[in-house]
Swiss-Prot record:
<keyword id="KW-0812">Transmembrane</keyword>
<dbReference type="GO" id="GO:0042773">
    <property type="term" value="P:ATP synthesis coupled electron transport"/>
</dbReference>
<keyword id="KW-1278">Translocase</keyword>
<feature type="transmembrane region" description="Helical">
    <location>
        <begin position="44"/>
        <end position="64"/>
    </location>
</feature>
<feature type="transmembrane region" description="Helical">
    <location>
        <begin position="144"/>
        <end position="164"/>
    </location>
</feature>
<keyword id="KW-1133">Transmembrane helix</keyword>
<dbReference type="InterPro" id="IPR001750">
    <property type="entry name" value="ND/Mrp_TM"/>
</dbReference>
<feature type="transmembrane region" description="Helical">
    <location>
        <begin position="274"/>
        <end position="294"/>
    </location>
</feature>
<dbReference type="GO" id="GO:0005743">
    <property type="term" value="C:mitochondrial inner membrane"/>
</dbReference>
<feature type="transmembrane region" description="Helical">
    <location>
        <begin position="90"/>
        <end position="110"/>
    </location>
</feature>
<keyword id="KW-0249">Electron transport</keyword>
<comment type="function">
    <text>Core subunit of the mitochondrial membrane respiratory chain NADH dehydrogenase (Complex I) that is believed to belong to the minimal assembly required for catalysis. Complex I functions in the transfer of electrons from NADH to the respiratory chain. The immediate electron acceptor for the enzyme is believed to be ubiquinone.</text>
</comment>
<protein>
    <recommendedName>
        <fullName>NADH-ubiquinone oxidoreductase chain 5</fullName>
        <ecNumber>7.1.1.2</ecNumber>
    </recommendedName>
</protein>
<feature type="transmembrane region" description="Helical">
    <location>
        <begin position="547"/>
        <end position="567"/>
    </location>
</feature>
<dbReference type="InterPro" id="IPR010934">
    <property type="entry name" value="NADH_DH_su5_C"/>
</dbReference>
<keyword id="KW-0472">Membrane</keyword>
<feature type="transmembrane region" description="Helical">
    <location>
        <begin position="210"/>
        <end position="232"/>
    </location>
</feature>
Length: 568
């Protein structure tokens, strides 16, 4: 039974690569549309869009999900609720595939909400305080995006259709672009919605591999890609997206440099790469953003699975200060992490190099990118190389504060097979897609020094690491306040989550005091109760003194009558 399951997952991985290579040479687009409801002014249909973008991305999701499912057989083997966990994982993947294939914004909401619901359940899988708070933060942040998508649907309602890839409005809605962009930013954790992404690391590592490579966080980028016509028609939207994405890039890079949690460092690297994709869309290069989306998904999944092997084999230690010289003990996992880190840094001839190099060179040629924006981009990319070198020299090769055993650890076949399947993509996917897809065939014209600067970026972080690491302990950057600033992502976690909680609780307290405990009580049950009580007290007084009142009145009447008789 287990061999049949492994064979099925292997076929899923091969099918994914078949989709990728077929989609890269796919020149047509097919729209399968089934009418559901029609009227004189409005129609609704269930539709699927099959083009090169959807085929390549579905193939990427299948490759990564098949690899992660195989990996889970080793990583989650001792879990009591393994079947429930895998059911949630497959529901997660199904929601993402549904979102990729559906161009109808109304039906896309099913996959969009499915991702939000299953991510909440997967992040809260371990059912402790940390996991539950992280799941709640993830769910509430994604609710903002859900509301913005619903507002976008209401705007599309006035246009008579919901197809986002062919939006030709009767009336141009300037706010629609902002709605779509900010909805995508909540899912892709761009500033100021970035606090939930590191918190989601409370989920099991295989879930993190799926979330940070090809499902949840990439859903926002994919929505913005599909809505490119809406965004490009409003220059203010692209300018806002450019500024926020560049600041997110620098924020994520600088925070990852000072972070000690291995999974958090990798999560922040995901955030920096997502901001690069958003930046590419903002300068009207959606195909380059998609190119990097695919290559990044593969090598980031490989990096997370390698990190999961390290953590699982070292008694769940995630602090890089407690991990050292693991190359001898975990050669396969370290090899996987090495390939992924080299590709993440944009080293020549790896998948990440082709997409990231193209993105940087085209941004140099774009007149809308100012020198300040370009410097922020370079700074963020240097940070990427810096923390990549930090992982290599600390976890793999270095001797840190804890001396771990250098004995060879048995790496299970279910652990090695996903590494092999993702090795292929991390090494050759960039050159294959770059050579086969016509939309990636840009002509780059740069000066020699500009081209050399792009080539130098992967090594800049290495040089910076070797020069700074010896002085970091005595540097003002290592003070408690500086570390607190960077480890809290520029206090973004407090600024985006704490004020919302304060406003919500104080607002609810005010509403409760003024309405629930105020006017509603005064005019409602308590007011009626008080009024009836006063009336009953008055009635009781009247009833008690009724005979006395009657006797007094009768006496007065008799006295009055007698007086009249006597004096008359």
């Amino acid at each position: 039974m287990q061999s049949k399951g492994n064979l099925g997952l292997l076929m899923l991985i091969l099918t994914g690569y078949l989709f990728i290579f077929t989609g890269s040479s796919f020149g047509s687009a097919y729209l399968l549309e089934v009418p559901v409801w029609e009227s004189n002014c409005l129609s609704f249909s269930f539709s699927f869009l099959l083009d090169n973008v959807s085929m390549i991305f579905v193939g990427t999701v299948l490759v990564i999900s098949g690899s992660v499912a195989t990996y889970c057989k080793w990583y989650m083997a001792e879990e009591l609720y393994y079947n429930r966990f895998m059911g949630l994982v497959w529901l997660f993947v199904l929601s993402m595939v549904f979102m990729i294939l559906v161009p109808n914004l109304l039906m896309l909401l099913i996959g969009w909400d499915g991702l939000g619901l299953t991510s909440f359940l997967l992040v809260a899988y371990y059912q402790n305080n940390k996991s539950l708070s992280a799941a709640m933060l993830t769910a509430l942040t994604n609710r903002i995006g859900d509301v913005l998508v619903l507002i976008s649907i209401s705007i599309f309602l006035s246009e008579g259709g919901w197809l986002i890839y062919s939006y030709h409005p009767v009336q141009m809605w300037l706010n629609l672009g902002f709605m779509v962009v900010f909805a995508g930013m909540t899912k892709s954790a761009q500033m100021p919605f970035c606090a939930w992404l590191p918190a989601a690391m409370a989920a099991p590592t295989p879930v993190s591999s799926l979330v940070h490579s090809s499902t949840l966080v990439t859903a926002g980028v994919y929505l913005v890609l599909r809505s490119f016509y809406i965004i490009s028609s409003n220059p203010y939207v692209t300018q806002v997206l450019m500024i926020l994405s560049l600041f997110t890039l620098v924020l994520a890079g600088s925070s990852a440099v000072f972070a000690f949690d291995l999974k958090k460092v990798i999560a922040l690297s995901t955030l920096s790469q997502l901001s690069l994709m958003m930046f590419s869309i903002s300068i009207l290069l959606p195909s380059v953003a998609f190119f990097h989306l695919v290559t990044h998904a593969v090598f980031k999944a490989l990096l997370f699975l390698g990190a999961g092997g390290v953590i699982h084999s070292n008694q769940s230690i995630q602090d890089i200060r407690g991990l050292s010289s693991l190359w001898q003990g975990l050669p396969v996992s370290m090899g996987a992490m090495s390939v992924a880190i080299v590709s993440l840094s944009g080293a020549p001839f790896m998948s990440g190099f082709f997409s990231k190099d193209l993105m940087i060179e085209l941004s140099m040629m774009d007149s809308s990118v100012t020198y300040g924006c370009y410097l922020l981009e370079l700074l963020g990319l240097i940070f990427t190389s810096f923390y990549s070198a930090r992982i290599v020299f600390s976890v793999m090769l270095g001797s840190n504060y804890v001396n771990n055993s250098t004995l060879r650890i048995n790496e299970h076949l279910n652990m090695q097979t996903p590494f092999l399947s993702l090795y292929i993509g991390a090494i050759i996917l960039g050159v294959v897609l770059g050579s086969k897809m016509e939309s990636f065939g840009f002509v780059v014209v740069l000066e020699n020094y500009e081209s050399l600067s792009v080539f130098f970026i992967p090594f800049a972080g290495l040089i910076l690491w070797r020069g700074v690491i010896s002085k970091l302990g005595s540097s003002p950057w290592s003070s408690a306040k500086s570390l607190s600033f960077f480890l809290s992502m520029w206090f973004m976690e407090s600024l985006t989550s704490h004020p919302g909680k304060v406003i919500f609780f104080k607002g609810s307290s005010t509403v409760a005091q003024s309405l629930d405990q105020g006017w509603l009580e005064l005019l409602g049950p308590q007011g009626v109760h008080a009024g009836l009580g006063q009336f009953s007290c008055l009635n009781e007084i009247v009833q008690k003194n009724y005979f006395t009142y009657q006797l007094v009145v009768w006496g007065l009447l008799v006295a009055g009558g007698v007086s009249l008789i006597i004096f008359m």
